[in-house]
């Protein structure tokens, strides 16, 4: 417990919260060739690799992912939600924050139904999350 005098001299410091999706916090200034702090909710990128990976211990599956080079030149691993996808190398995708709990290092999701990513075929419920149009 600090004394009043210590509080007057040093004061209280507020906690610094760390971002859960740090790649979305920066944009790239190509004229100055430098990163600029400019947080964004989503970001566009180009898929450099599309593949599958296996989840952590209690679970078993082949989860689809894409390695994406963002418009701020940062490369991240993003999860492709839903059943089936049309992504391949050089597809332009939109990513948002949001981790996948059983895939280490995957902190981003690809937005279905935006840019080159098609919505999930035959989806009837929660369509807005998977970019599916109403029949």
Curated annotation (Swiss-Prot):
GO terms for cellular component: small ribosomal subunit. SUPFAM superfamilies: Nucleic acid-binding proteins (SSF50249). Pfam families: Ribosom_S12_S23. Residues 9-18 have a biased composition (Basic residues). GO terms for molecular function: rRNA binding; structural constituent of ribosome; tRNA binding. Keywords: Ribonucleoprotein, Ribosomal protein, RNA-binding, rRNA-binding, tRNA-binding. GO terms for biological process: translation. Residues 1-20 are annotated as: Disordered. InterPro entries: NA-bd_OB-fold, Ribosomal_uS12, Ribosomal_uS12_bac. It comes from the Bacteria. Part of the 30S ribosomal subunit. Contacts proteins S8 and S17. May interact with IF1 in the 30S initiation complex. Belongs to the universal ribosomal protein uS12 family. With S4 and S5 plays an important role in translational accuracy. Interacts with and stabilizes bases of the 16S rRNA that are involved in tRNA selection in the A site and with the mRNA backbone. Located at the interface of the 30S and 50S subunits, it traverses the body of the 30S subunit contacting proteins on the other side and probably holding the rRNA structure together. The combined cluster of proteins S8, S12 and S17 appears to hold together the shoulder and platform of the 30S subunit. This is Small ribosomal subunit protein uS12. It comes from Lactobacillus acidophilus (strain ATCC 700396 / NCK56 / N2 / NCFM).
